[in-house]
Amino acid sequence: MMAKNNKTTEAKMSKKRAASEESDVEEDEDKLLSVDGLIDAEASESDEDDDEYESAVEEKESSSDKEAQDDSDDDSDAELNKLLAEEEGDEEEDYDSSEFSDDTTSLTDRLSGVKLQTIVDPNIYSKYADGSDRIIKPEINPVYDSDDSDAETQNTIGNIPLSAYDEMPHIGYDINGKRIMRPAKGSALDQLLDSIELPEGWTGLLDKNSGSSLNLTKEELELISKIQRNEQTDDSINPYEPLIDWFTRHEEVMPLTAVPEPKRRFVPSKNEAKRVMKIVRAIREGRIIPPKKLKEMKEKEKTENYQYDLWGDSTETNDHVMHLRAPKLPPPTNEESYNPPEEYLLSPEEKEAWENTEYSERERNFVPQKYSALRKVPGYGESIRERFERSLDLYLAPRVRKNKLNIDPNSLIPELPSPKDLRPFPIRCSTIYAGHKGKVRTLSIDPSGLWLATGSDDGTVRVWEILTGREVYRTTLIDDEENPDDHIECIEWNPDANNGILAVAVGENIHLIVPPIFGYDIENNGKTKIEDGFGYDTFGTVKKSNLEVNENGDGDEDGENESAKNAVKKQVAQWNKPSQKQLEKDICITISCKKTVKKLSWHRKGDYFVTVQPDSGNTSVLIHQVSKHLTQSPFKKSKGIIMDAKFHPFKPQLFVCSQRYVRIYDLSQQILVKKLLPGARWLSKIDIHPRGDNLIASSFDKRVLWHDLDLASTPYKTLRYHEKAVRSVNFHKKLPLFSSAADDGTIHVFHATVYDDMMKNPMIVPLKKLTGHKVINSLGVLDAIWHPREAWLFSAGADNTARLWTT
């Protein structure tokens, strides 16, 4: 046995020596050959993966060698003997091969026996804790289209916020239950620098897995920049790929296939016939119901099982074209309540009067009664009668359908410019001329625009300096003891600024005054012009009135009564020299008329002025000439009560305003030119636009009427905005403004643009409502007048004051 064991040990030793010699020979050959550049075609892994794979293979081989050694120790003697016999045979073969081997073999002969091992299975095997095999697969390299939404997160805290770990050194746990420690934070200075100079890819968010700031990678930043520049995000996509013309743009002449149509396309289909017959049988048997019949069945079922919804919304049906619905009954009022307020209950006297009234004349068919509870209310006894009368009304009374006009109210309002764009115009009261003891009925402004004259019921005429409000002149023209009923009705400056004549209408007299406020030259010119008329009779001239206006406009009466025309007429007014007492009051001349003079207006040249006496009949309108001391009555008879009269601004025309009409007369041709129909009940005053083609009129029935003389005789605009009678209307001589004053104590200022284009209508824009005068005894603003040049307005009121309104 010992010998046997020695043999086996020697055999093993020899085998080890042979293995070591072979390994040395292989190493030398590897050094000489250096086959590092040979790569297996099937191996596609990286160098690191190959190293890991080789280490794993070596571990596996070593483990298998150990297992083989353990098993060989336990083999039986027979197996050992068999192995020894095989080893001896191998040694003999090796000895024979080595003995006859030739050292001069070529390199190619040596490489021909070399075999390269290829990796077929890319998986790496390891052991689990229980000893079973564990496959470690290589890491997956994700491509662009891959999705990592289901990837496992490193931090497994779930929905717990990171703020729960603020006081702990860790931020969560991984999948193995180990703590994930909080990353180290820099100093306060580092944090400040990081907040000032933001790092590249900064988002301001925290990474839940690591607890550090979550920054964008270069690839993500590049992707965002490409999206901002509207560029292609995937480089693998070519936006300019060559066009594949699926359908040729050239029209082919010959067909692609010229196969003739088969016969089955012209023969009725048997399959379709079977399907149609199947449907027909189903309809006959009632298994298929046509839509029309099904609809009728549903309607019939609906009518049979109809249940009225008492609380449902009422559905309106479309009426016939000729059908008119009955008007709805008015809803009940408070007096029809079972518990009405006390003021709705009738007193015994009212109840007795209601019972004595005829049924058809009663305002209501019942007497309001009060009950403590609704259950105590009896039945209404007049219900049958009311229903019967309503049926009679619906049956006998005709009804007409009135179509409602769907008009937008805003479309009816004209588009007017803003008042801010139409300045200047008066907006405030700057001066109050106080001093009169009675109502200031009239006022007038000097042509130079420096002096304001006012006339009051206290019998005085005062002249004020406009800018300072100082009274510079005063004269008393009415003696209350002699003429208690007279008033200063009208006052008007001469339009010629070189004479300073002031005409004042006091009762039946007209005084021409030259106030001593202008200086010697102007005062002398005015007095000289008045005194020149006294010498008119001295030179033998005859006072004739050759002005007679034919109101009918006919030429038939021109040849009649020529002698009567040339004859001397009876004087309608008398020019009197002033007395010594009147000279002390600066009165230069007095014109005595028959009746009270209400209105006075100068001609633009300053030689003529017209007066109105409403109660004087056919001599209501008189035209006076200062240079000749001549008074003429242009009309044979009066048509209505004359309220006002004015000259045209530049034409020889006279505007005469009666209570209801405005007539325009041509003084040169002595005919009636036009008759205006304002439509008001009682006109009070008129004024003509400086251009002469428009006229405004005021009325006591609270209206202001604008007439365009180039259009119809009816008003172009009728303005109703005053609450009481309108006393005065005036145009500005230079600016596109006009005003209206009324007894409600207000003055309305308007912008009025008159265009040169005859196709354009005047534009009227309300600007300002001026309030300041007090209403006394239902009298407010009695007169108003504009400054000759500035946008200033003067007003006279019943509160004994005159006011200046400026911008």
Swiss-Prot record:
There is a cross-link at K127 (Glycyl lysine isopeptide (Lys-Gly) (interchain with G-Cter in ubiquitin)). Residues 57-69 have a biased composition (Basic and acidic residues). GO terms for molecular function: ribonucleoprotein complex binding. The modification Phosphoserine is found at S23, S72, S76, S146, S149, S418. Keywords: Isopeptide bond, Nucleus, Phosphoprotein, Repeat, Ribosome biogenesis, rRNA processing, Ubl conjugation, WD repeat. Gene3D superfamilies: YVTN repeat-like/Quinoprotein amine dehydrogenase. Residues 383-419 are annotated as: Required for interaction with YTM1. One of its GO terms (biological process) is maturation of 5.8S rRNA from tricistronic rRNA transcript (SSU-rRNA, 5.8S rRNA, LSU-rRNA). GO terms for cellular component: nucleoplasm; PeBoW complex; preribosome, large subunit precursor. It comes from the Eukaryota. It is found in: Nucleus, Nucleolus; Nucleus, Nucleoplasm. Belongs to the WD repeat BOP1/ERB1 family. Component of the NOP7 complex, which is required for maturation of the 25S and 5.8S ribosomal RNAs and formation of the 60S ribosome. This is Ribosome biogenesis protein ERB1. It comes from Saccharomyces cerevisiae (strain YJM789) (Baker's yeast).
